[in-house]
Design a protein with these regions (language model features):
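Membrane-embedded alpha-helical bundles that constitute the cytochrome b-like, heme-associated redox core
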Residues: 1-218
Length: 218
């Protein structure tokens, strides 16, 4: 690879982060938007994958801030502006989608409603209720977001916590559809440059032969 081609290619770290996040996002969008038909054993990894996406995205942002990305290939000004906007929104989605999911989990009640406890107890005392725990890859417990979990300690906390859970569940699902739309735009733009403009766009992310020159005007 010559120097000019190397300048148009992302670093190996950026390429790894890009494809690792892409695969995890594809898994999560599939298991999330199709959760009614996805086997429970497969969906069990949805949360672990989401937390991993959040961590890798933070690493990717840190890497991007400390390592200048390569210049864009030649394109019209409107395409350049569109690419910048879509990239920014994708980063927002990679952060907000896992965070809304985390908030939803944090709004999961640690204890059943008092009425349910009394109904189950019968003549005998109810057994101790185990707090709901979310394991990440079976290695550690995902802590709850304290401001949300503490809602349970407020007057009428059970009802408020349920409302909060439903709110973030709706937001999380909405983020999934927004994320899917952004990915369609991102992939469509990349394929347009690769197949129609005959530019080696995919080579910038490690697929195929590298591009040969940059657009000096960008």
């Amino acid at each position: 690879m010559d120097d000019a081609a190397a300048r148009l290619r992302y670093t190996n770290v950026a390429i790894f982060l890009h494809w690792a996040i892409a695969l995890l996002v594809l898994f999560n969008l599939t298991t999330g938007l199709l959760h009614d038909v996805v086997p429970r054993a497969v969906f069990a990894f949805h949360i672990s994958s989401g937390v991993t996406i959040l961590v890798l995205t933070l690493i990717r942002i840190g890497w991007r801030l400390t390592h200048k990305p390569p210049p864009y290939l030649p394109m019209a000004k409107w395409e350049y502006a569109g690419a910048k906007i879509v990239h920014f929104l994708l980063y927002c989605a990679m952060l907000l989608s896992p965070l809304t999911g985390w908030a939803m989990i944090s709004a999961h009640a640690d204890k059943p409603p008092a009425a349910a406890i009394q109904a189950d107890a019968g003549p005998q005392p109810a057994p101790p209720h185990k707090p709901h725990r979310t394991m990440i890859w079976g290695l550690f417990v995902l802590p709850k977001l304290k401001p949300i979990a503490d809602i349970a300690n407020q007057p009428g906390g059970d009802a408020k916590l349920k409302e909060t859970h439903e709110l973030y569940e709706e937001r999380h699902e909405t983020m999934g559809w927004i994320f899917l739309g952004l990915l369609v735009l991102h992939l469509g733009g990349a394929l347009k440059h690769q197949l129609i403009d005959r530019q080696r766009e995919l080579a910038r992310m490690g697929i195929g032969k590298p591009a040969e020159r940059a657009d000096s005007s960008l």
